[in-house]
Amino acid sequence: MSVTDETQVAATPGAEAQGTQTQGTQPAPVVSFGTEPGRYRHWRLSVDGPVATLTLDVAEDGGLADGYELKMNSYDLGVDIELYDAVQRLRFEHPGVRAVVLTSGKERMFCAGANIRMLAQATHAWKVNFCKFTNETRNGIEDASAHSGQAYIAALTGTAAGGGYELALACDEIVLVDDGSSAVALPEVPLLGVLPGTGGLTRLVDKRGVRRDLADVFATTAEGIRGEKAVAWRLADETAKARDFAAVIERHRDVLVADRIG
């Protein structure tokens, strides 16, 4: 789940999401799962030989429902539907891709996670199914790496918080820009009083090998961890100054391509 105060897919006629409306919530919006890269509002997908780039650039006014803006690259179900579509298209339409760079189109912000205002106005059923869907999308990224030979690199050009960092954790490698302010964070506990809802704590310990005591400290530190400390705690694989960031990502990408092709 996430951090910030603020979630796309164009609503077209389709199956209506189910959920009982309660006081303070809005009716579930009509959701269409039919999309393709030419219709994405929040992602850009490009393929160059064995390398693909997925850029998250969320349209603030592109939420599935009224009542919230998708600020700071936060996401709602519509954003994640596009991500799911892109991951599966890479597997089936571009099987020759060996490395996928997941990055942001916003300055100093990778992703602030699930949109809090969207969650606040949603029904309980919607929240549960939203978390399940986002989990399945991140599992799909890991499955593409394990079984389709497509490794993912999270190129964090800015802060990755809450569900934004959980998205990065689904990738094979994480590179964080070292600009003095960009951090990785799971601030759900100190800010919202809830546990991360998209596998963050499990992946920290089981996938990345973060020490449990450090994971506990990290999950109760609202401001997150920056720079070399993030690498020392195994929260990221490498940091790079902004001037060197593109070259470092290219190096990681080329190594992964060589490993997967070789």
Predicted region positions:
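Amphipathic alpha-helical segments at domain termini/boundaries
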Residues: 1-14, 24-63, 166-170, 211-262
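A structural preference for short, pocket-lining loop segments at secondary-structure junctions
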Residues: 49-56, 76-125, 135-155, 177-181
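A solvent-exposed, charged loop/short amphipathic helix patch at secondary-structure junctions
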Residues: 58-75
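Alpha-helical scaffold segments in soluble metabolic enzymes
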Residues: 89, 136, 203, 229, ...
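Glycine-rich beta-to-alpha active-site loop
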Residues: 105-106, 110, 141-192, 218-219, ...
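A glycine-rich helix N-cap at a beta->alpha junction
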Residues: 127-131
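Hydrophobic, secondary-structure "cap" segments at the distal end of domains
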Residues: 199-214
